[in-house]
């Protein structure tokens, strides 16, 4: 056991986590050179296309150190994006140490900080690594100083390497073996294994990634899930070298995978503890704190025949992504679907793309909203995650919106622009600290403004240099109203949105104008209106298509023309009464882009 090292790699987006993982795998001979490819651990197509890590992946490697001993390295590559911070905290729970990778050109960023603090809170040994020293813009001494000033860990002898060229990666491994402690645990004690992650395989059922804290697990053992009390047979187990390799036993302190032929997706929940049926442990391991979704949106299949397939797909995805929440929902405009909860907009996009790609579904998404706290006139407090669930205006005593605490790190020259942006988003500044050329800003901004497009706008006002980390702080009373959209004087529930009264008129007008461009012209006039309660705040009309009925008249009497026009008018009127308007998918996406341009 003393030769096992469990560690994660944490870093801000694009600081080179996945490339460093590649080099480590190559150095330890986990894959032959022929099988090696760039970003070996980003196995999803989506991850490769966007160049981001979404799922944490684990690998077991053997490393022969300079002291002649062979060490077993279990390491987990984690995502850097704020929306996937839950993946990071789960990975860290399985480790004794973490490599903090910092880009020697860009320096410390907000996400580096957030993930690093998570690691320190969990009592992990943090080893700083300065990556990308081969870049002309690299300034390792300045960055080492920054790590000490901002993060507060000693970085004077931080390892310097370049994951791309492979320089200094050997030193990283030596430092790892030296500084990160070996796992603690009792090989003879009853088995306690933590489920870090699980996913669904069509042939094997549920595959779980586990970390053995105490005891040992052998092939063929009967294991028991501690929260549900169900027992399963350990059919196959092994490790990833990134390839799946079968083993007969997983020892204390190791990280590996386990297949128990569990067909039910909720059979082995993530964060649960496995133990042996014949000799169970007394207590479960502390799991992970459940994350609360911050953004909700309705997802509906385009054709209602796909509903069952959609439900199964969501079940399988939520097994793999424990932070996804979903419940059934019906909408008059869109039929049956699900109300899903996400950690942020990127998370929502990724889930939607994964559903469309991996499960071949066509989906319509409604506008994302956050959770509001409503105190009704009966003094009940309810939580509303969808505009259609909001009670009528006269039943609401107080509406409170969620406030997010945003920590931003940015170079000084962009300070003015970023502060202007925060004020525009109704933000309140709570703190500002200068570290050398960097400024650390703390603002309290309504969550609805943050999840809509704050991140994109922040990046564009600061030319990509500012970084953001945010978390829910509290609910605060605010003057929010629901804006309804009426097409042909029928309310379309899927298009309603909740917004601040000050922005309601502008948002309503923008939305109505946008819808006007997207709804195809019909044989009759279509009125599109935005309303707060019964008060109409904006309107536009999609003009009808009409045939030129006078084309066949040459000169002649005006009453003849009037008769033809009158006849056409009556026809149009009749059409308008029975006609209904098909709304295209783009119309629902229009809400997402209101206020972007």
Curated annotation (Swiss-Prot):
Please tell me one Gene Ontology term that the record gives under cellular component. Answer: plasma membrane
Name the EC number(s): 3.6.5.n1
The record describes its membrane topology as: Peripheral membrane protein
Q: Which InterPro entries match?
A: EF-4, EFG_III/V, EFG_V-like, EFTu-like_2, G_TR_CS, LepA_C_sf, LepA_CTD, LepA_IV
Keyword set, alphabetical order: Cell inner membrane, Cell membrane, GTP-binding, Hydrolase, Membrane, Nucleotide-binding, Protein biosynthesis
Which reaction(s) does the protein catalyse, per the Swiss-Prot or TrEMBL entry? GTP + H2O = GDP + phosphate + H(+)
Residues at which GTP binds = 14-19, 131-134
Q: Where in the cell is it found?
A: Cell inner membrane
One GO BP annotation of this record: positive regulation of translation
Q: Name one GO molecular function term.
A: GTPase activity
Stated role = Required for accurate and efficient protein synthesis under certain stress conditions. May act as a fidelity factor of the translation reaction, by catalyzing a one-codon backward translocation of tRNAs on improperly translocated ribosomes. Back-translocation proceeds from a post-translocation (POST) complex to a pre-translocation (PRE) complex, thus giving elongation factor G a second chance to translocate the tRNAs correctly. Binds to ribosomes in a GTP-dependent manner.
Write the protein's name: Elongation factor 4
What organism does the record attribute this protein to?
A: Edwardsiella ictaluri (strain 93-146)
> What is the gene name?
lepA
